[in-house]
C-alpha cells in the first residue's frame, strides 16, 4: 500500500502537472470534504476542475507527513493573474484523500521580501 505522502504527491502530480482526471477515482474518497472557499466538496468537483486547468503549471516544494496528514508547499502559475505559493493539506485514509485544506498567497519575488529570500523553493 502507498504511503500517505505518496498518495498526496500522486494526486498533485496527476491533477496539476499531468492533468490526469483518473487520479480522482484512484485517490479521492467519494465523500471527499473540501475546505477551499471556491471548490465544492465531493470528488466530482475535482474531476470537473482538472480539464479546465489548461494554462496551469505547478511545482512541488517541501513535503511533510505526520499520521494521516500530508502538507505540501507548492507554487501555482496560471491559477490567477500572479503566481501563487500555497500549502495544501491532505487527510488520507485507506489510500484515499478524504479531506483537503489550502492556504494560497500571491508570490512576492525574493527581491521584494524583507529577508531577500524567496517564498518558495522547488524540491
Q: Model-flagged regions — what are they?
A:
Residues 1-123:
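C-terminal and inter-domain tail/linker signature
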